[in-house]
């Protein structure tokens, strides 16, 4: 899920055409907020000012996936946030994971899941 290709061009109408993985995306406002962008799970819609923030989002998803693999936990699909927290709480307790790290790790996982649209 890394940015493979990003090229940016400006014209006289202050529009920005961004090409991410060969897909053209047009923004009317150069300062459009990242909160107004949509995530498909693999290729997010980006604007110039959101690229740095987006890299942080990718890091959170990567961290979530790495950490879940490290502790050998596979999350069921279509859980809401409360069900996800309960599932992780039980799974971590069964595996003997230090409970002091629990809130931090669950927070990273929830953020990663929300970003990747696996939970609403």
From Swiss-Prot:
This is Uncharacterized protein R427. It comes from Acanthamoeba polyphaga mimivirus (APMV).
């Amino acid at each position: 899920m890394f940015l493979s290709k990003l090229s940016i061009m400006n014209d006289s109408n202050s529009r920005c055409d961004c090409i991410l993985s060969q897909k053209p995306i047009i923004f009317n406002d150069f300062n459009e907020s990242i909160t107004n962008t949509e995530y498909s799970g693999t290729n997010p819609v980006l604007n110039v000012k959101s690229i740095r923030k987006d890299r942080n989002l990718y890091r959170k998803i990567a961290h979530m996936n790495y950490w879940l693999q490290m502790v050998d936990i596979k999350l069921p699909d279509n859980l809401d946030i409360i069900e996800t927290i309960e599932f992780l709480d039980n799974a971590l307790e069964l595996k003997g994971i230090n409970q002091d790290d629990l809130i931090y790790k669950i927070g990273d996982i929830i953020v990663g899941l929300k970003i990747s649209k696996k939970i609403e």
